[in-house]
Amino acid sequence: MNKAILHTIIVYTLASCPYCIKAKALLDEKNVAYEEIEVSNFTQEEKEKFIKKSGGKKTVPQIFIDNMHVGGCDALFDLEKEGRLDKLLENQPKTTSPAAGA
């Protein structure tokens, strides 16, 4: 069965987290669509699933591209600095409008 995925980039966040805001700003600059999942209201079961999916990490943001765990904000910016982020994002759905401030 072929399952269509609307967003293949998922960012687990907290609204007040400055690293989450920074990571989302970079993705916005790249004009790629992503699904943001706010973790503050997770049940205990959801928290456990999140931690397991994130390889034991309990911090946010946690970023996934095509079901691959990228890591947090620093890891995302490391990919950008190394010139590898654009390659990971090249087949991702684009946003319909340019990034704010562009």
Curated annotation (Swiss-Prot):
One GO CC term, this protein: cytoplasm
Subunit architecture: Monomer.
Domain of life: Bacteria
Principal location listed in the UniProt entry: cytoplasm
Subcellular location(s) of the protein: Cytoplasm
Family: Belongs to the glutaredoxin family.
Higher taxonomy: Bacteria, Pseudomonadati, Pseudomonadota, Alphaproteobacteria, Rickettsiales
Domain Glutaredoxin: 1-96
A GO MF label: glutathione disulfide oxidoreductase activity
Native species: Rickettsia conorii (strain ATCC VR-613 / Malish 7)
Annotated disulfide bonds: 17-20
Name of the protein in its database record: Glutaredoxin 1
Swiss-Prot/TrEMBL GO biological process terms: cell redox homeostasis; cellular response to oxidative stress
Functional summary from the UniProt entry: Has a glutathione-disulfide oxidoreductase activity in the presence of NADPH and glutathione reductase. Reduces low molecular weight disulfides and proteins.
PANTHER family assigned: GLUTAREDOXIN 2, GLUTAREDOXIN-1-RELATED
